[in-house]
């Protein structure tokens, strides 16, 4: 059985930094378009797709706290950054004819709909791509935690994390050339080894809800399809 058949509904986590491309800030529209093209390709395979995007290309809440500011306000600013990125990716998907809706954990009715689990499930059952903005809607939680939470809420078969590298390493391979790459890990091993691919809350939530995680490079065109076909280069996290 192929991974495409095993994974009918997926939650894709995309970092905000992935949208920057070669820029140092903001959104590279050509990168957003390429990511959207990969998503459109897997939709044609019949895979239901939901997405959570980070906001680090625009703002990080911890930046405020590190300079003596209020962390809660900083995190709220970060949530708004995820909304900007979500609208950008929706625009790229819409250009390809992919019906897409943005649901936000923080209310902004003039811009997008508010999140509810029932609404998200309804849209996914209609074949629409659903993008979750605003993180969890609460400060002190990362968008990785938001992605795991939404994956649990919609009953996703797997959490796919598109990153800057092709899997999970013992250290940043761009800095440490001797970093060990893992093909397979358990949630417990990630926690025990202190691997920084996701925060502890996200990994624990995935483990408690039996959600496997696949980590792959978001930068390879067609990489998402390869992952779902089981032919790509990635790391699988499961019990």
Swiss-Prot record:
Residue numbers binding UMP: 55, 75, 136-143
Pathway the protein acts in: Pyrimidine metabolism; CTP biosynthesis via de novo pathway; UDP from UMP (UMPK route): step 1/1
Sequence positions that bind ATP: 13-16, 56, 60, 163-164, 169, 172
Activity regulation summary: Inhibited by UTP.
GO biological process: 'de novo' CTP biosynthetic process; UDP biosynthetic process
Entry-linked SUPFAM superfamilies: Carbamate kinase-like
Any one GO molecular function term: ATP binding
E.C. number: 2.7.4.22
Enzyme class at the top of the EC tree: transferase
Reaction equations catalysed: UMP + ATP = UDP + ADP
Classification via InterPro entries: AceGlu_kinase-like_sf (IPR036393), Asp/Glu/Uridylate_kinase (IPR001048), Uridylate_kinase (IPR011817), Uridylate_kinase_bac (IPR015963)
Compartment annotation: Cytoplasm
GO CC annotation: cytosol
Subunit structure: Homohexamer.
Family indicated by similarity: Belongs to the UMP kinase family.
Full protein name: Uridylate kinase
Organism whose genome encodes this protein: Bartonella bacilliformis (strain ATCC 35685 / KC583 / Herrer 020/F12,63)
Lineage: Bacteria, Pseudomonadati, Pseudomonadota, Alphaproteobacteria, Hyphomicrobiales
């Amino acid at each position: 059985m192929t991974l495409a058949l095993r994974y009918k509904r997926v939650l894709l986590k995309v970092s905000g930094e992935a949208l920057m491309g070669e820029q140092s800030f903001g959104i590279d529209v050509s990168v957003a378009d390429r990511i959207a093209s990969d998503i459109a390709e897997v939709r044609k395979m019949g895979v239901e797709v939901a997405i959570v995007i980070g906001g680090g290309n625009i703002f990080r809440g911890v930046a405020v706290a590190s300079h003596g500011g209020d962390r809660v306000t900083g995190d709220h600013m970060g949530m708004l950054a995820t909304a900007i990125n979500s609208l950008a990716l929706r625009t790229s998907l819409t250009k390809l004819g992919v019906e897409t809706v943005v649901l936000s954990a923080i209310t902004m009715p003039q811009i997008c709909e508010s999140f509810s689990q029932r609404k998200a499930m309804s849209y996914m059952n209609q074949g629409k791509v659903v993008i979750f903005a605003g993180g969890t809607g609460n400060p002190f939680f990362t968008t990785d935690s938001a992605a795991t939470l939404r994956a649990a809420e919609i009953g996703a078969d797997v959490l796919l994390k598109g990153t800057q590298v092709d899997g999970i390493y013992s250290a940043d391979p761009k800095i440490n050339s001797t970093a060990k790459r893992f093909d397979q890990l358990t949630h417990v091993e990630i926690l025990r080894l202190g691997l920084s691919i996701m925060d502890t809350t996200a990994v624990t939530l995935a483990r408690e809800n039996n959600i496997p995680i696949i980590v792959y490079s978001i930068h390879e065109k067609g990489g998402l399809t390869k992952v779902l076909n089981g032919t790509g280069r990635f790391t699988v996290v499961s019990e």
